[in-house]
Design a protein with these regions (language model features):
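Secretory-pathway luminal glycosyltransferase catalytic domains
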Residues: 44-192
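N-terminal pre-catalytic "stem/leader" segment of glycosyltransferase-like enzymes
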Residues: 1-42
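Leloir-type glycosyltransferase catalytic cores
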Residues: 273-297
Length: 309
């Protein structure tokens, strides 16, 4: 049995699930999800209001009752070892080589935002992250627009909300300015020509005021509290031909789940503003990076739009 602790929003929970799914697949073990942290059960204390958000997918894994996880993690008798061995991700997203040697009966705690942790189980993860039909049906009209577009479609994600209003999150992640999106779109346009933008955001007013939008572009907004709507938005992202990401695990997954073999994915560099965080393995090597620190009068260098090495 592999048990993974869930925390954060949809994108974070997906990384946690994917890492646990890969470890379980290596050992032919069952994957169990511990939602006690986000539920606030069993004495767990979360600093943010979250909930279990993986219900939008057709998952076979189950969410364990907090009492069961508690029994597995601790020994009833002092002389007995806990049933599960705990493995915690190193601080600041540092690589965890112990994960590759982890055995069955392991409890995973961390964010695990590293594609190498589950690349050997990619087929399992993609199959598991199949959206339920009712999720896809929520935005069927927008999905039709994406499919009927005569020019390539681009999913562009803008995240503001907590990145602006929460000092801790703002200091760690930082916000992306209009110049990043402008340079990303210029780089895309130089390779594929005219495109139609589908902008997904928690701040539509900011997007309309700060992004270069045409009449044919679509801006679709949702508040952070609308979890079901965000799930349908991620599903829409997967339908687009190309992707411009925010520094958010949400749009990371929207791009990664896209089945297009010719997709171009643009991600900001650095991903996390706090330089203590390790970025090795966070961005797939075939994706491209645009520096987020450009000013409006500083065009990108010739080496900016290049594969990550």
């Amino acid at each position: 049995m592999i048990v993974v602790q869930l925390s954060g929003g949809l994108g974070n929970q997906m990384f946690q699930y994917a890492t646990g799914r890969a470890l379980a697949a290596r050992h032919g073990a069952q994957l169990v999800l511990d939602s006690s942290w986000i539920d606030g059960a069993g004495g767990a204390v979360s600093t943010e209001v979250r909930r279990y958000e993986l219900g939008c997918f057709e998952l076979e894994s189950r969410v364990a009752p907090v009492e069961q996880v508690g029994r597995l993690r601790r020994s009833v008798l002092p002389s007995r070892r806990p049933t599960l061995r705990e493995l915690e991700e190193p601080p600041f997203g540092q690589p965890c080589p112990e994960l590759l040697q982890a055995t069955d009966n392991t409890y995973l705690r961390g964010y695990w935002q590293n594609v190498t942790y589950f690349e050997d189980a990619e087929a399992h993860v993609r199959r598991d992250f199949t959206f339920r039909p009712e999720i896809a049906a929520q935005q069927a009209d927008v999905a039709r627009q994406i499919g009927a577009s005569p020019v390539p479609t681009v999913s562009l994600h803008v995240r503001r909300s907590d990145y602006v209003t929460d000092p801790g999150v703002r200091d760690r992640m930082g916000t992306l300015e209009p110049e990043y999106y402008s340079h990303a779109l210029d780089a895309l346009g130089s390779g594929i020509g005219s495109v139609r933008l589908f902008v997904f955001t928690d701040d539509p007013a900011w997007c309309r005021a700060n992004l270069r939008l045409s009449e044919q572009d679509v801006v679709l907004g949702a508040t952070r509290a609308e979890a079901d709507k965000w799930a349908s938005i991620m599903q829409l992202m997967t339908l687009c031909d190309h992707h411009v990401l925010a520094n958010s695990s949400f749009s990371w997954w929207g791009a990664w789940l896209s089945p297009s073999p010719t997709k171009i994915v643009v991600a900001p560099r650095p991903w996390v503003q706090d330089s203590r965080w390790d970025e090795n393995g966070r961005i797939p090597s075939e994706w491209v990076r645009i520096d987020r620190g450009y000013q409006a009068d500083q065009p990108p260098s010739t080496t900016t739009f290049a594969p990550v090495t």
